[in-house]
UniProtKB/Swiss-Prot annotation:
Protein family per UniProt: Belongs to the RBR family. Ariadne subfamily.
UniProt name for this protein: Potential E3 ubiquitin-protein ligase ariadne-2
Zn-finger (IBR-type) residues: 222-284
Binding site for Zn(2+) 6: C337, C340, H347, C354
Catalytic reaction equation(s): [E2 ubiquitin-conjugating enzyme]-S-ubiquitinyl-L-cysteine + [acceptor protein]-L-lysine = [E2 ubiquitin-conjugating enzyme]-L-cysteine + [acceptor protein]-N(6)-ubiquitinyl-L-lysine
Amino acid sequence: MDSDIEMDMESDNDGEYDDDYDYYNTGEDCDVERLDPKRADPEYFEYECLTVEDIEKLLNERVEKLNTILQITPSLAKVLLLEHQWNNVAVVEKYRQDANALLVTARIKPPSVAVTDTASTSAAAASAQLLRLGSSGYKTTASATPQYRSQMCPVCASSQLGDKFYSLACGHSFCKDCWTIYFETQIFQGISTQIGCMAQMCNVRVPEDLVLTLVTRPVMRDKYQQFAFKDYVKSHPELRFCPGPNCQIIVQSSEISAKRAICKACHTGFCFRCGMDYHAPTDCQVIKKWLTKCADDSETANYISAHTKDCPKCHICIEKNGGCNHMQCFNCKHDFCWMCLGDWKTHGSEYYECSRYKDNPNIANESVHVQAREALKKYLHYYERWENHSKSLKLEQQTIDRLRQRINSKVMNGSGTWIDWQYLFNAAALLAKCRYTLQYTYPYAYYMEAGSRKNLFEYQQAQLEAEIENLSWKIERAETTDLGDLENQMDIAEKRRTTLLKDFFPVDA
């Protein structure tokens, strides 16, 4: 009997901590996570930062491998690889299944009249077709017509000898000068691998070696090769250009997911999957929709533009000059939340209500105008918080700059060294990382369907937001904050952040 009572009491005591314990203090698989960083860090991502020369070598190896198998020129090999995301295996398999269809799909040869003879679509037949084109995808008219016989160019209407004409697999023949002018015009417009035949309604692709044979000006040749290289990299799913200004680094990873890559040269961070600013936990498609909506809704800028609000107690105008949303009126010393203007003393228990949008349960029965107003109200709720955290990141950077100046003065006066004060900059860096994640939770919540999963997300979002504001408050008052207290707050905030990402970051989306 007594043992049963004791077990019940233990169970009840455990229940008091269910909310926090279940989400943040399970300690499950701790040993595994220490050994496997992928389990411990939801943002863990293996990648390499490579130079242009490194990537050229990598791509050339793929080209040479395909050349050996199919016995074609590097020019045609690049076309086939470009169309199949640089997957040699896929190209060879399709070549063996239906080589003719492969060449048509890659725009190396034009669609022909349907054939019933299966031999005509075999690899041998396709190879013979390529051999007739010199294995390159183009030929001079002189190869089929005596060089001394003249013909008329359908573009410039000039009559020239046959060796001055070039044609693709489609058979459309044009003089050398017209091809050259056409190529340079296309290159000037930024087109390279997608240059097609000059003939109307013909989409046969011009191979690289024909372009480089006829375009002799070094400037145009360099431009063509630069544009072609960009096309090759963009078509390769495991490669991504660093979006940093004037940066030449290319990131390579076999894990094609929406993880953060940081360039080793310019230190730009971005999403590897889409190349945009890193946006976890929101996936690539949703963030594109959100940013498009933000750009289109111009009235939002006017709504959000004000940097001032009135104190809810004494009504004096207050300007927000820091990143923390825990505000204290300089006049009456009233503590309140910048976002909802609620009393900060009770705000800790009500943070869930502050960050959470309350839908109108009867909205489906309302008029179109009421529904439109409700939709705008919902959007502004999320946008205001999204924009506020963006501004807070900038304001907190200003706080760090002021902090650096104060610490420099202390160091100059003999009050410790820079190493002694490094913990403050570590705290500021963690705060920026946490707030950045929090900012991108709002587009995620905006498009999330109502239900238990959204309720859980908003709960974790509110917990993260509360701990971020606590950390920001302590950093802004760093000189009076206990080191142990600050480090404890850093640990709590990071745990909230990683827990949310583990539960909701759609890395495979």
